[in-house]
Amino acid sequence: MLIKRREFLKISSLAAASFMMPNFLKAITFDDALEPNQKILVVLQFTGGNDGLNTIIPSRNDIYFRERKKIAIQDSLPLTDEAGINPALSYFKELYDKGELSVMNNVGYPNPDKSHFRSMDIWHSASKSNEYLETGWLGRYLDEECYRCEHPTQALEVDDMLSLALKGENNKAFAFKDPKRLYQTSQEKYFKSLYDHHHDDETVSYLYQTLGSTINNAGYIFEKSQAKKTTQEYPNSQLGKDFKTVASLIKSDINTQVYYLSVGSFDTHVNQNERQQKLFSDINEAVKSFVADMKSNGLFENILLMTFSEFGRRVAQNASDGTDHGTANQMFFISGGLKRKGVLNALPDLQNLNEGDLIYSEDFRKVYATILKNWLKADSSKVLGWKNGIYDFV
């Protein structure tokens, strides 16, 4: 059966939604739901390099205000005597006050790379800065779990394409933007007919395999997303819709332990405060609805929401009322099951810089190792090759 270029692109488009659906996901229809009190990780990626110094503000540091005469945050919400949080993240302040938020400062890695693409690859793969890996840290987690577990663990990304973080050597997560749209597309007669009439020896056989996997599983994911309708109101932003999708799946009996979302762009070279405030407002309201939803369903104790960005920004503002690519940054951890709460370590040292950039003190791979071992109950040394200890915030 020959296909035209237009038809090939249609198949490719649907295949991209799953980005090579892993074989283990086919069996998930027959798996039991997550065990009671099973921990769930939700990753929220701040794409573009969020400015950490205008997120957690060193509110009593003269250097900060001197280097950022026009963009320094003057009305931060106090967390400690020395640190405040951006007022657009007012709900994060509420979580902090309730002991449901932790923040780790100065997170990075040796020899940092200021390229968006390369630094994101490093964060996704948990590689060294001079090491190039084709698998992601959560993808290798799937490889490890699916090898030793009777019921394989599933991961889902709410996006059109699958991130490197979720690609393993043998197993990959499943990426989709909207369960209903994916299901409706998979049910089109054209795709079903095409799949029914393909031949194994065709040069595009891999696309047909992916197409079949997507058709078989799109209905299952859509069914689970509709299983327990939420009464919680969510903002109409894209991130609000994405969190609503995640919440609906968590409340169903789908066997999913990792969810991955992203928001951006935080690449604020020009007029930073206006752009960052808009993004933070979207994040603030979406997270507020999601946490309320999880709490009302008795699930918040077992949910860990982790945020990260590929790098921070330079200490000094630029001439365009923005900031340029930097290095170390902070990470947020939100959960009803935190063991250590609040500001976990010292604020950035603005007197000790590396050519105008912050110097990292906490390796992001140690954060990953902590989450893998203490939250997901995985062998972090096998997944990461990390043997330099873990933290105790979860």
Outline where the language-model segments fall.
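Feature marks hydrolase-like catalytic cores characterized by long aromatic- and Gly/Pro-rich stretches
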Residues: 72-84, 268-277, 281-394
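N-terminal secretory signal peptides
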Residues: 1-3
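Intrinsic-disorder/low-complexity recognition with aromatic hotspots
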Residues: 23-86, 96-98
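Beta-strand elements within well-structured catalytic alpha/beta cores of enzymes
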Residues: 39-50, 92, 102, 257-263, ...
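N-terminal export signals
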Residues: 7-27
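Patatin-like phospholipase A catalytic core
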Residues: 146-235
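Extracytoplasmic mature domains of secreted/periplasmic and thylakoid-lumen proteins
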Residues: 84-85, 89-184
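Anion-binding catalytic surfaces of enzymes that hydrolyze or transfer phosphate/sulfate esters
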Residues: 198-289, 293
